[in-house]
């Protein structure tokens, strides 16, 4: 509550969480039963903390923690579906929801690497607390069309990340944000969107953050779509 209040006093609302498994070791959706139990226990704590912060959107990226090496597509789904249903139950208890994020292979992923694959998992899990994440950087890397993806999967999407390939500052990766904005306005009006980027090495962080915010405000800040860092 203190953390939430501190940010609120400064006009910032905490709306989502990611890097859910940062600092952990050996956790994998496709691990043994004991590994799965440990992973779910950790994610239960994340959901509890998220609920306390008002962060209801819990973004599950973590490509190395969904390593399906050695499994066929069918075998992977046979394991993933019950796991995510259990995770959905946990998230719902805390009033949060999980957003499964497509991570392309260049980010180290081999499961849910595209929007279509991720949407298929969400559809098969069929749980109200398991949603899909739309990530503009992943769309760009995969050569996916944002308008087509939104038209097909808008009803599955729970959160949107505005990102560039390799998590460059927003505006530095060649994404047509006017096109993204138009698609969001058409298919997900009123959807909150969030900047996702990593720290820059060749300029002060405050400079890159300010540049990214200017891009977000220019393209996304309006009555229909509001960008938050």
Where are the predicted features?
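Active-site-proximal loop/turn and secondary-structure-junction residues that shape catalytic pockets
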Residues: 20-23, 64-66, 102-106, 136-138, ...
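Aromatic-lined substrate-binding rim segments of carbohydrate-active enzymes
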Residues: 1-11
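Short, well-structured secondary-structure segments
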Residues: 13-17, 58-59
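Conserved, mostly hydrophobic/aromatic
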Residues: 7, 17, 50, 80, ...
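Histidine-acidic metal/acid-base catalytic patches
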Residues: 40, 54-56, 115-134, 138-229
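Active-site acidic/histidine proton-transfer and metal-coordination neighborhood
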Residues: 9, 26-131, 141, 223
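Short active-site-adjacent helix-start/loop capping segments
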Residues: 15, 23-28, 203
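Short, flexible/disordered intra-domain loops and linkers
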Residues: 1, 108, 203-207
